[in-house]
A protein has these predicted regions:
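Short acidic/glycine-rich loops and adjacent helix/strand connectors
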Residues: 1-137
């Protein structure tokens, strides 16, 4: 399991992101920020989901190219399942489910808030205990 290659997909709000992991090591990641919301002073949910629909394919292809991998190297997909904007989540979940089904690999639903917390463990064997996590999101 340590060398398993996992593709991570994140579309919970207004950033489209993908990352490749080999075991606990992040190989490469890309985050596309949606500038379409700037003039509105906040995120417009409908625009966010449309932008995810436009950006997700290129972001996933880009992360694979940067890592010099193809979809055939991916052994599982982790995707944000919530909480977040319903339309944005639907785009990411649908894309990930389609890939997982087409590649016949496992799909893992990830809680967005728990993902923030567990990101502290990326690249770490352990964290010194006890530790406290304050999470402010949104």
């Amino acid at each position: 399991m340590q060398d398993t290659v996992i593709l991570g997909i994140e579309t919970s709000c207004d950033e489209t992101a993908a990352a490749l992991f080999r075991g606990p090591e992040m190989i490469h990641h890309i985050t596309a920020t949606q500038l379409v919301h700037t003039s509105y002073g906040g995120v417009v949910p409908e625009y966010a989901s449309r932008e995810h629909n436009k950006l997700l394919g290129p972001v996933v292809r880009g992360v694979l190219e940067q890592a010099e991998m193809t979809l055939s190297n991916v052994e599982g997909i982790a995707v944000t399942q919530g909480p977040g904007l319903a339309g944005s989540l639907l785009v990411g979940l649908s894309y990930a489910k389609g890939l997982a089904l087409g590649l016949d690999i496992p799909l893992y639903g990830i809680n967005h808030i728990e993902g923030h917390i567990f990101a502290n463990f990326i690249g770490q064997k352990t964290l010194p205990t006890p530790f406290l996590c304050l999470l402010v999101s949104g």
